[in-house]
Amino acid sequence: MSSVLTDLLNLDLSDVTEKVIAEYIWIGGSGMDMRSKARSLSGPVSSVKELPKWNYDGSSTGQAQGHDSEVILYPQAIFRDPFRRGKHILVICDAYSPNGTAIPSNKRAAAAKIFNEKAVSDEETWYGLEQEYTLLQKDVKWPLGWPIGGYPGPQGPYYCGVGADKAWGRDIVDAHYKACLYSGINISGINGEVMPGQWEFQVGPSVGISAADELWCARFIMERITEKAGVVLSFDPKPIEGDWNGAGCHTNYSTKSMRKEGGFEVIKKAIEKLKLRHKEHISAYGEGNERRLTGRHETADMNTFSWGVANRGASVRVGRDTEKEGKGYFEDRRPASNMDPYIVTSMIAETTILWKP
């Protein structure tokens, strides 16, 4: 990139204008593709309520017909923009038809209804989302660092590995980590995964629907960073067939009752509810998850529900600290890396708090 272009991209506008750039972000028709466009605001904003609604051509995103293509964006969450910096912002939006009804691909609206239920809000649901992903070489769609058409050595040395022959893509990972912290996303950590070229970042603990807003924004930031790096970001739950780990989005969850004394009994009752609705959850936990949930590579078989303490081959894992202290949280290990966090987080809350067997 030329120095002139770099200088222009890094221009500090604060001395010449009060205007602020807002990048409006939404989810496209596939349910995983992220879209965005920017607009100028007259000045800084302190609340999402100050932001105007906007619209876009839904016929170009698979979300509307050409003869009636306008879809309306409702701003829902604000984050600092790590690319433009200054007072510029990223805005997570959801999408509605002109008559005010949520379009079918808008999963946030239904999630918000669940999280706004008094029984749910009173429980102050906490989520920690472990987003696994794979970095691919742009032109061949093969994992970063792998020989083209070939394979690296067997799994073993790559998980949390260090070294040029074990960890590929660390600059991207660290850039993303810092960008999320700058943005105000509650990112809590990163690590290299079992399959080389695969990494993980964690968001949370965050309360209610904010966990999903933060994960979608973190995904957007990663998409932008990999775009800049010339690398393809994949959320495929099983990007490479064979003796290689898949990619999930393990979802850690607790309620106020679970975090109190005697909470372990509440956890066990919640897990029993999840068992009774196992099929419904599996069907909503990500496309292609059957390629990942095979009972191998630290997964449970998708057709069987199981849970255990410290068991990473179970559907639901309870940590040893939770068992020892008699309170805490549990981890739902079933969601795939391409899951929609609005669906998964709200469904877990609905099943464990609202649903009556």
From Swiss-Prot:
Biological process annotations from GO: glutamine biosynthetic process
GO CC annotation, single: cytoplasm
Keyword Nuclease part of the UniProt annotation: no
EC category: ligase
Gene3D superfamilies in UniProt: Glutamine synthetase, N-terminal domain, Glutamine synthetase/guanido kinase, catalytic domain
EC number: 6.3.1.2
Reactions performed catalytically: L-glutamate + NH4(+) + ATP = L-glutamine + ADP + phosphate + H(+)
Gene Ontology terms, MF aspect: ATP binding; glutamine synthetase activity
Domain GS beta-grasp, first and last residues per copy: 20-100
Domain (GS catalytic) ranges: 107-357
Subcellular location: Cytoplasm
Principal place of residence: cytoplasm
Keywords in alphabetical order: ATP-binding, Cytoplasm, Ligase, Nucleotide-binding
Chain segments annotated as transmembrane: none
Pfam families: Gln-synt_C, Gln-synt_N
Entry superkingdom: Eukaryota
SMART domains according to UniProt: Gln-synt_C (SM01230)
Entry annotated with the keyword Chloroplast: no
Miscellaneous comment text of the record: Irreversibly inhibited by the herbicide L-phosphinothricin (PPT).
Assembly: Homooctamer.
Family, as annotated: Belongs to the glutamine synthetase family.
Protein known as: Glutamine synthetase cytosolic isozyme
